[in-house]
């Protein structure tokens, strides 16, 4: 089953629902959905849709939603059956990100989008070959 994330591009939402991107863009304008700039894309045309309760309710009432059996409700958490199986580094990174402010998280996301993981590791002085 597919899962709606809390932020999606128009292309991702259109693909999930099986409609055209133009249809999703029209819904954004008509319904006044909240959007934000997509980090790392020049020109300001790429936008992220903030999938809130208003968006979820509208999507659930569309015929496209009912004709798509692979779609679940937004923001449903995936059950983690083996929480202790994660590597310590993974847990530390997640904890660090959880402790960041929204602005700090956005800056990290922009940096990773712009520079990539290799430059991120290089900034941390971590050698890939080791």
Swiss-Prot record:
InterPro entries: Cro/C1-type_HTH (IPR001387), DNA-bd_dom_put_sf (IPR009061), Lambda_DNA-bd_dom_sf (IPR010982), YfeC-like (IPR010749). Gene3D superfamilies: lambda repressor-like DNA-binding domains. GO terms for molecular function: DNA binding. Coiled coil: none annotated. This is Uncharacterized protein YfeD. The gene is yfeD.
